[in-house]
Structure formats: C-alpha cells, structure tokens
C-alpha cells in the first residue's frame, strides 16, 4: 500500500489503495494448479505486478492467451535487452523465436533475476502456449515473428530519425497492440480493430516509457541502448547523456517537451480505439494503462526531475485509476483532466509550445465532443482535504476496524 505520509496527504486514496491491495492478494491466489500454468501466472506477477492485476479483468480463455502472449514477448525482449549476448548470437535467436515457442525442449539462459528464471524454464511457457486454441496460437506466432524481425533490424541500427523511432516503437509495442486486437477478435468479444489504431495504442505506451525511463537507461551498466531519436535530441545537446547534467537543464527540458509532444500525437487514435470496444472487461484492460500513460506524460512534461530521479504517478492515484475506470466517460474525463494539467505547464517560450498546445487542444476537443465530461471523476483537481484532521481520524478508525475484522477471521479459521 502507499506510504503513510502519502495517505495522510491524500486521504481519499486510502479506499482505492485498500481495494487494490485486496485485489492483488486475490489475483495471486488465483494461480492454476497445473504446473506449466502455475509457472506462467506466478511469473506474470513477478515480471509485471500491474499487468498481472489488470489481466484479471479478462475472461478465462482470453486471459490465458494474453498471459502467454505477454510472457513470450517478455522473453523475446529479455534476449534483445541482454547486452552480454553478441550480435552474431542474438540476431538468429530473435529471428527464430516464433519457432522456439512450439518447442518445449528449447531454452536459452540470459537475463537476470526473474527474467533468467523465465528463460531457463521457458518450456513451461511453450507447454502452456500449445494448450491454447489455434486462432490464439496463430496470432501469437505471427506477432512474435514480426517483432523478432524488427528487433533484429534495430540490433544493428541506431534510432536516428523520428521515422526510425516510430518504426522501432512499432516493432516492440505497436505490434503488441495489433496482437491484442487479434486475440480480442479471436475470442469473439470484439470486432477486429484497424492496424493503425492498434499501433497507436502500443506507441503511446512505449513512448511514455522511453521518456520516463531516460535516467535509468542512460545510467545502466553495462550501457543500455537508448531510443530517444537523434533528430530530436541533437537540436538541444551534442550528446544524449548531456541532458542529465544540471548545466544543461533548460535545454534538457525543451528536449523532454519535444519528446512528450511527439507522444501526444497518438492520443486521439487511442481514444478512438477505446471508444469502439464493446466488452467491459477488455475495455478496462485497455483503458487503465492508457490513462496511466497520459498521467505520466503530464508529470514528466517540463519537469527536470526526469533527468535527476524517478517520475511516476503516486500509488494512490494509480489505485484510483484502476478503481474508477469503468466506462468511456471515465477515459474522456481522465484524458481531459491530464491534458488540462499538461496545458497549464506549457511555457510559451518553449520552441514547441505552439505544436504542444495544438495537440492538447485536439485531445480536449475530442473529449468535449463526447458529451460526457459532466460525468467525469477528477483525478488531478484535488481539494485541500488532505490536511483535514477529521478525515485522518476516520482513516485510522477504518484501519482499526479492518484489523479487528481480519484478526477475528484469522482466529475463526484456526478453530
């Protein structure tokens, strides 16, 4: 759960945080008994706790397919990311990865921590993959093949231009969007979305992660590959690592704002994609990460902290997004609120201010035209109730009641 200080400052976070904690515990207890499926779901919770929780929104068959799709691509990504593997070894592996998923004897030791376990025990993922229906397997194989080919191309190529950046993000994330759309369609729950909209869903998330993770990636040892395009950063500094130095703060923020503005171009497509979804479970599965993405961009924009430390939404706000995202009106409301926050941070002297404002106004126009903004729950316009001692007292009363309830249940279970 969030820290006590954060809860006291934002007491309305408490209930969503509590619900999130209970849901996470429940999700971890839903691990199947069959060995290969037990491995896959327990590994899913280890490599992505948030995804492991969001995936529980889906029905059983689709949930299994998405779980395996995620783990297969996570394994492929582990090979791509391992800088200790030579290009001569790495390229053939990623190119043939779509074949390896059919071979339950195949494994390749690489990565660290839980990712090494995933790779060493990959036969569990292969066995689970082989259990899936043929339409699910075909979709996963196709996307894995295309992603592997794209990764192989960029193992030997730097991201120089914005077109390169879009192409790389297509291979590693846009294809995930295409694959998920295929899985949703295969389940019979959704019409097949267009490739361009599916691609934008992936690019919006991937570009947000690339922006947010600048400092972690630039400081990684051994040195990680970087994906900020030279066409953008070279306008501001001579070397990409120069952005992290305090004397370059003004230029660094301008570069950051340029990157955020580039990411915002995908937001309208994302809204269109989500508005076309019919099933509430699939809708929540798709919508929650997209709201988190625009919220993260709003925090990163014009913020030197991106080059100094970690910038992310507080856990309580994340819990609120997960708890409150139920309908498209919630999505329009969140995108509108976060675009308002972004707009308030635009410096008119920024070289990209006009372009940034234009993109934000386009997002706001789409949200307004939905006609649902009056129903929205605000994520970012908060009252000063965080300092209200009565509310703080209520929190501790609730905690005491909860503790007593859980303790009594524990005693009853022991009898």
Swiss-Prot record:
One of its GO terms (cellular component) is endoplasmic reticulum membrane. It is found in: Endoplasmic reticulum membrane. The chain crosses the membrane at residues 281-301, 391-411. Induction: Induced methyl jasmonate (MeJA) in adventitious roots. Induced by A.niger mycelium-derived elicitor, thus improving ginsenosides production in adventitious roots culture. Pathway: Terpene metabolism; lanosterol biosynthesis; lanosterol from farnesyl diphosphate: step 1/3. CDD domains: Trans_IPPS_HH. It catalyses: 2 (2E,6E)-farnesyl diphosphate + NADH + H(+) = squalene + 2 diphosphate + NAD(+); 2 (2E,6E)-farnesyl diphosphate + NADPH + H(+) = squalene + 2 diphosphate + NADP(+). Keywords: Endoplasmic reticulum, Isoprene biosynthesis, Magnesium, Membrane, Multifunctional enzyme, NADP, Transferase, Transmembrane, Transmembrane helix. InterPro entries: Isoprenoid_synthase_dom_sf, Squ/phyt_synthse, Squal_synth-like, Squalene/phytoene_synthase_CS, Trans_IPPS_euk-type, Trans_IPPS_HH. The keyword Transmembrane helix applies. Its cofactor is Mg(2+); Mn(2+). Its EC number is 2.5.1.21. PANTHER family: FARNESYL-DIPHOSPHATE FARNESYLTRANSFERASE, SQUALENE SYNTHASE. Belongs to the phytoene/squalene synthase family. Component of the triterpene saponins (e.g. ginsenosides or panaxosides) and phytosterols biosynthetic pathways. Catalyzes the biosynthesis of squalene. This is Squalene synthase 13. It comes from Panax ginseng (Korean ginseng). The lineage of its organism: Eukaryota, Viridiplantae, Streptophyta, Embryophyta, Tracheophyta.
């Amino acid at each position: 759960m969030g820290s006590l200080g954060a809860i006291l400052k934002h007491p309305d976070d408490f209930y969503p945080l509590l619900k999130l904690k209970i849901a996470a515990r429940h999700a971890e207890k839903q691990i199947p008994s069959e060995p290969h499926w037990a491995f896959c779901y327990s590994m899913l919770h280890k490599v992505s706790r948030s995804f492991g929780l969001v995936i529980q929104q889906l029905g059983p068959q689709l949930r299994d397919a998405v779980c395996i799709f995620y783990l297969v691509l996570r394994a492929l990504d582990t090979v791509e990311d391992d800088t200790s593997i030579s290009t001569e070894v790495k390229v053939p592996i990623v190119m043939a990865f779509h074949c390896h998923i059919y071979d339950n004897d195949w494994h390749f030791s690489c990565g660290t921590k839980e990712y090494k376990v995933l790779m060493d025990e990959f036969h569990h993922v292969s066995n689970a993959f082989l259990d899936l229906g043929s339409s699910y397997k075909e979709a996963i194989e196709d996307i894995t093949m295309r992603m592997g080919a794209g990764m192989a191309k960029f193992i030997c190529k730097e991201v120089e231009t914005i077109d390169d950046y879009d192409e790389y993000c297509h291979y590693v994330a846009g294809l995930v969007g295409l694959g998920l759309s295929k899985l949703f369609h295969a389940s019979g729950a959704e019409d097949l979305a267009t490739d361009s909209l599916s691609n934008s869903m992936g690019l919006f998330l991937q570009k947000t992660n690339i922006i947010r993770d600048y400092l972690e990636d630039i400081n990684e040892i051994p040195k990680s590959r970087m994906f900020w395009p030279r066409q953008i950063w070279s306008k501001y500094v001579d070397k990409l690592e120069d952005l992290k130095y305090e004397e370059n703060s003004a230029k660094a923020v301008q570069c950051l704002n340029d990157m955020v503005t580039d990411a915002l171009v995908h937001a309208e497509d994302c809204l269109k994609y989500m508005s076309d979804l019919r099933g509430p479970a699939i809708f929540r599965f798709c919508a929650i990460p997209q709201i988190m993405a625009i919220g993260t961009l709003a925090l990163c924009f014009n913020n030197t902290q991106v080059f100094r430390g970690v910038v992310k939404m507080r856990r309580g706000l994340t819990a609120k997004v997960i708890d409150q995202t139920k309908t498209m009106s919630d999505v329009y409301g969140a995108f509108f609120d976060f675009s308002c926050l972004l707009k308030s941070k635009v410096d008119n002297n920024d070289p990209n201010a006009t372009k940034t404002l234009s993109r934000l106004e386009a997002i706001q126009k789409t949200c307004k035209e939905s006609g649902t903004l009056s129903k929205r729950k605000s994520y970012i316009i908060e009252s000063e109730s965080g300092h209200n001692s009565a509310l703080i007292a209520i929190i501790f009363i609730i905690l005491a009641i909860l503790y007593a309830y859980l303790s009594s249940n524990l005693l009853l279970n022991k009898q």
